[in-house]
Amino acid sequence: MPDLSDRQRDLCSTAPATYDDLRAALVNCTLKPSPQPSHTDTLLDVVGHIFQANGVEVDRVRFRDLEVAPGVYPDMTEHGADADAWPEVWPRIRDAHILVIGTPIWLGEKSSECQKLIERLYGMSSELNDAGQYAFYGRVGGCIVTGNEDGIKHVGMGVLYSLQHLGYTIPPQADAGWIGEAGPGPSYGDVVDGEPVGIDNDFTQRNTTFMAWNLLHLARMLTDAGGIPAHGNQRSAWDAGCRFDYENPEYR
């Protein structure tokens, strides 16, 4: 696990707030099962270290290791699956103030495990919080992308769009990643000539640091504010007939 740089440690020591009441779920959507090393895990380590240095409770999940069935229902064993670990995984994500999804790039796209995670999150999108809003309101999300082909921004675009559609709040610059040279070659953290590749890449370290801190800042703001104000966005109130000043569409 890479250590934080002096600059990153200095930022942690001068934090403008406390974050030790926050929880973060870092979900690695690598296609590799444990104990195979994951390049995506290596970059997620940087985010995890920044969070932990600020007292955040960090829960690491390698999605590939869990027997999560594909589908868009809360429990796919009720829809034909032989087994489904999602009912055990879901509370770990639901209770986190911060969700960071890590994915490799394959054929210019996020991994199939990442797509499955997003679909399972979508299956929970009808859940409501105590204010009658969708369950993901008041939570923040970001993503980490690795690979040795272009596609960081394309993958980040899809992941972050999906998260905001579900109700997550996305801070500025909520994606970061590393890609190597085009074609087969070393990936993030691979050792070449005695040195790990990409660890000292300033662009990657800067963007990863900015993402981690923007997630912390926004999670702090939303938590202190009690979440997103509950007006004009409550599914329970809409279903009860409230239209929040929406004009009557009938012709008069």
Name each region found by the language model.
Residues 38, 130-185, 203-206:
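Short, glycine-/small-residue-rich phosphate/pyrophosphate-handling segment
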